[in-house]
Amino acid sequence: MAAPVMSALGRLQGLIRTERSLLTHVQSRCIQTTSVCLKNRAARVRVGKGDKPVTYEAAHPPHYIAHRKGWLSQHTGNLDGEGGAAERTIEDVFIRRFIFGTFHGCLANEIVIKRRANLLIICAIFIRKMPTQKFYFLIGYTETLLSFLYKCPVKLEVQTVEEKVIYKYL
């Protein structure tokens, strides 16, 4: 009779030890203390050895917006009493990604998106990497598709340059 009680007691103690070790294992796995989670990222290009070419937009940090550089999206959604700022931001992200994918490797600078009443104007500077006919086709394709998606007229204002315009080296 004593043997079954001792074996049951031993099994119970073993179960408690196993539960404690599982509990400490689970608790230690829930806390993530990796250095990757603690990194901060600056929204500017860091100054290096002076061999990194940057454009005018990238050379100035974000706190110079409206002083030395302009807004990349111009609309009235952020005025007091106006709604739809979040929707316009999502639309701007889609437009930027769409144009980056359509004109892959040809963007020389950031895209500026302007909204005037019902008209959507997209200003871009491209590098001449493709034949002119292909540029004209892609511009018409982009205007037509975005006009169909957003149910408003879309106009692309395009300039082309031979190579990427470098403002300075950081």
Curated annotation (Swiss-Prot):
Q: Where in the cell is it found?
A: Mitochondrion
What GO cellular component term, any one, is given?
Answer: mitochondrial small ribosomal subunit
User: Which GO molecular function annotation, any one, does this entry have?
Assistant: structural constituent of ribosome
Presequence extent in this chain: 1-30
UniProt-listed GO biological process terms: mitochondrial translation
- Family under the similarity heading: Belongs to the universal ribosomal protein uS3 family.
Subunit structure, as described in the record: Component of the mitochondrial ribosome small subunit (28S) which comprises a 12S rRNA and about 30 distinct proteins.
Q: Under which name does UniProt file this protein? A: Small ribosomal subunit protein uS3mA
Its source organism is: Xenopus laevis (African clawed frog)
**Gene giving rise to this polypeptide:** mrps24-a
